Design a protein with these regions (language model features):
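Membrane-interface module
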Residues: 1-4, 10-32, 169-196
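Selected alpha-helical membrane-embedding segments in polytopic membrane proteins
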Residues: 6-107
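Hydrophobic alpha-helical transmembrane segments of polytopic
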Residues: 12-23, 63-68, 103, 127-130, ...
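Helical transmembrane-bundle signal
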Residues: 20-30, 68-72, 107, 111, ...
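Transmembrane helix-loop junctions in multipass membrane proteins, especially transporters and channels
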Residues: 31, 35-39, 80-88, 118-122, ...
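Membrane-proximal helix-loop-helix units in multi-pass membrane proteins
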Residues: 88-149
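Terminal transmembrane helical module of multi-pass membrane proteins
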Residues: 134-196
């Protein structure tokens, strides 16, 4: 789990890949609920556009919080199991505290910004902001974990910046960033773990 007591290395590839699958599923659900096709049946159900927007906002906020909790738990518990399989202790020591702090600050700032935008009805750049701040969080914490997290962080950052310039397809960018890139990272970690 620890590499010279300065790096947390017990990140489970299966857990990371599972997070990617959950993100793709969430993007699909969001597209079916809020996309062009989904808007029809929601409009029939709610009729009034202000009621529809209030419903969309509630579903988006609750769904996002639930997804973050499930994905975070998946990575946490799968990494704890991996550390135990390697015969290492999974402790909240100084390295883990630095990792969590460096990851949490940009992630929390981006999350609060996204929540404020959604609650004010400004949905346009929400997916971009999520990708950008998540990328910054990974870049900020990769010094205390596996260096490949920095690569993922730069990829998320670039994808988020590209998403800023595309008025449509926000869920596609979101699905690629949080879904496909996590699946690829998970597969990389699985192969790397099997070779060592």
């Amino acid at each position: 789990m620890m590499e010279r007591s300065s790096r947390f290395t017990a990140i489970n590839g299966w857990g990371v890949a599972a997070v990617g699958v959950m993100a793709i599923a969430a993007a699909w659900v969001a597209a079916s609920l809020f996309g062009q096709e989904g808007a029809g049946w929601l409009s029939t159900l709610y009729g009034n556009t202000s009621m529809l927007m209030a419903y969309k906002t509630r579903v988006a906020v609750v769904g996002s919080l639930l997804l973050v909790a499930v994905c975070g738990s998946t990575v946490f518990f799968s990494s704890m199991a991996q550390a135990r399989r390697r015969g290492l202790t999974f402790a909240f020591d100084a390295t883990m505290r630095r990792l969590v702090l460096n990851f949490s600050v940009p992630l929390l700032a981006g999350g609060i910004l996204c929540l404020a935008l959604v609650l004010q009805g400004h949905y346009g750049l929400t997916s971009s902001i999520m990708l950008i701040f998540y990328g910054l969080a990974l870049i900020n914490c990769h010094h205390f974990s596996q260096p490949v997290l920095g690569v993922l962080g730069y990829a998320e950052l670039a994808l988020g910046l590209a998403d800023c310039f595309v008025a449509t397809h926000a869920l596609l960018f979101w699905g690629v960033g949080f879904g496909l890139l996590h699946i690829l990272l998970g597969l990389y970690l699985i192969v790397k773990d099997r070779r060592s």
